[in-house]
Curated annotation (Swiss-Prot):
Organism placement in taxonomy: Eukaryota, Metazoa, Chordata, Craniata, Vertebrata
GO-annotated cellular components: plasma membrane
Glycan-carrying positions: N60
Subcellular location(s) of the protein: Cell membrane
Polar residues composition bias: residue spans: 51-62
Organism encoding this protein: Equus caballus
Signal sequence, renumbered to the chain: 1-26
Official protein name in the record: Endothelin receptor type B
Alphabetical UniProt keywords: Cell membrane, Disease variant, Disulfide bond, G-protein coupled receptor, Glycoprotein, Lipoprotein, Membrane, Palmitate, Phosphoprotein, Receptor, Signal, Transducer, Transmembrane, Transmembrane helix
Domain of life assignment: Eukaryota
Residues with PTM Phosphotyrosine: Y440
Lipid attachment, kind S-palmitoyl cysteine: C403, C404, C406
Length: 443
């Protein structure tokens, strides 16, 4: 009678396994559309698909299945193949983005959109209309504002739509164009900040170089290189993004995302290393260059301060003001882009789709991603505000330009447009310093 317990144990184990298989198959029949996320999907693909108010219980990600409705495993498959097709354990609670967050996100995005267009357009008009503002640093700031304006006009409306809507109605051309413009505008911002930091060090290191009116040839070359390099680095985005048809709750949706399977080895490598590449080049690089050249600039100031002539002290104050402005722009950039890069790095380091507690982390990362997108968009509209607060010259010119836009068209005269900035700056102590330094250099 000794084999009886062993036989009963085997029967009990068989019943448990049968119940488990039946439960898994029942779950698959009940929630076929949003059952599992393909393991190749990156974190920004979590962003691109529709984000409903709540996802069905048992879903392990915020994206629908990128395939046809699931089929039952065939009897001829091996045990290893069946284990690979089984989905991860279901979530204990739903993954959701509440309607309140959607409304707040929409309001914030609209506010950033309006402020960004007004601020960057005003900044470009100030530099274009007034010859006294056309110098090397200001032309780089104008390039920065133009890149921000492209980001605001193209990306912010699309990001708001992706959060509120389900389908992608814009076609494959816009699917490739939007991420291309986004990466190009970010590249323009990053490289412009790097060029500004290097330019400030060169201005302090060469005390004999007096700032004048006009665009230096080297600055023009820098701007051309910045735009060309930014466009070239954004080409993989246009190549990798594509339209995918996804099965979601019984209906097929068109989704724009970085395709899970790329055609070339380079694009597959780019897809796997994309988030680390964005973090290192588009975030760490400008911070490292700014820290390096501002350290050299500080050492140069301390070394030459005692030996400078008194007449150059006022000119030094002007360069310090410009350096402070550039430093504020870099600091604002770091604070605005940190949440977005942090969410993507956390996704790569902490998220495990086989973890039973992954759903809470995924909900947190999804919300953090949208907060990061809003903060990154905020960087595009906050640069003119930072210039208004830090620089007296930009503040006076902003006041003049906004007042001119509030007046009627008949009251505008070309002579006032050309001389108003100079009138404001004539009352500014910084302009007197600049004029005295020019007199000293001419003598």
């Amino acid at each position: 009678m000794q084999p009886l317990p062993t036989l009963c144990g085997r029967v009990l184990v068989a019943l448990i396994l049968a119940c488990g298989v039946a439960g898994v198959q029942g779950e698959e029949r009940r929630f076929p559309p949003a059952r599992a996320t393909p393991p190749l999907l990156g974190f920004e693909e979590i962003m691109t698909p529709p984000t409903k108010t709540s996802w069905p219980t048992g879903s392990n990600a915020s994206v629908p299945r990128l395939s046809a409705p699931p089929q039952m495993p065939k009897a001829g498959r091996t045990a290893g193949a069946q284990r690979r097709t089984l989905p991860p354990p279901p979530c204990e609670r739903t993954i959701e983005i509440k309607e309140t967050f959607k409304y707040i996100n929409t309001v914030v995005s609209c506010l950033v959109f309006v402020l960004g267009i007004i601020g960057n357009s005003t900044l470009l008009r100030i530099i274009y209309k007034n010859k006294c503002m056309r110098n090397g640093p200001n032309i780089l700031i104008a390039s920065l504002a133009l890149g921000d304006l492209l980001h605001i006009i193209i990306d912010i409306p699309i990001n708001v739509y992706k959060l509120l809507a389900e389908d992608w109605p814009f076609g494959v051309e816009m699917c490739k164009l939007v991420p291309f413009i986004q990466k190009a505008s970010v590249g323009i911002t990053v490289l412009s900040l790097c060029a500004l930091s290097i330019d400030r060090y060169r201005a302090v290191a060469s005390w004999s170089r007096i700032k004048g009116i006009g665009v230096p040839k080297w600055t023009a070359v820098e701007i051309v290189l910045i735009w060309v390099v930014s466009v070239v680095l954004a080409v993989p985005e246009a190549v990798g993004f594509d339209m995918i048809t996804a099965d979601y709750k019984g209906s097929y949706l068109r989704i724009c995302l970085l395709h899970p399977t790329q055609k070339t080895a380079f694009m597959q490598f780019y897809k796997n290393a994309k988030d680390w590449w964005l973090f290192s080049f588009y975030f760490c690089l400008p911070l490292a260059i700014t820290a390096f050249f501002y350290t050299l600039e500080t050492c140069e100031m301390l070394r030459k301060k005692s030996g400078m002539q008194i007449a150059l002290n006022d000119h030094l104050k002007q360069r310090r003001e410009v350096a402070k402005t550039v430093f504020c722009l870099v600091l604002v950039f770091a604070l605005c882009w940190l949440p977005l890069h942090l969410s993507r790095i956390l996704k790569h380091t902490l998220y495990d789709q086989n973890d039973p507690h992954r759903c809470e982390l995924l909900s947190f990362l999804l919300v953090l991603e949208y907060i990061g997108i809003n903060m990154a968009s905020l960087n595009s509209c906050i640069n003119p505000i930072a210039l208004y607060l830090v620089s007296k010259r930009f503040k006076n010119c902003f006041k003049w330009c906004l007042c001119c836009w509030c007046q009627s068209f008949e009251e505008k005269q070309s002579l006032e447009d050309k001389q108003s900035c100079l009138k404001f700056k004539a009352n500014d102590h910084g302009y007197d310093n600049f004029r005295s330094s020019n007199k000293y250099s001419s003598s």
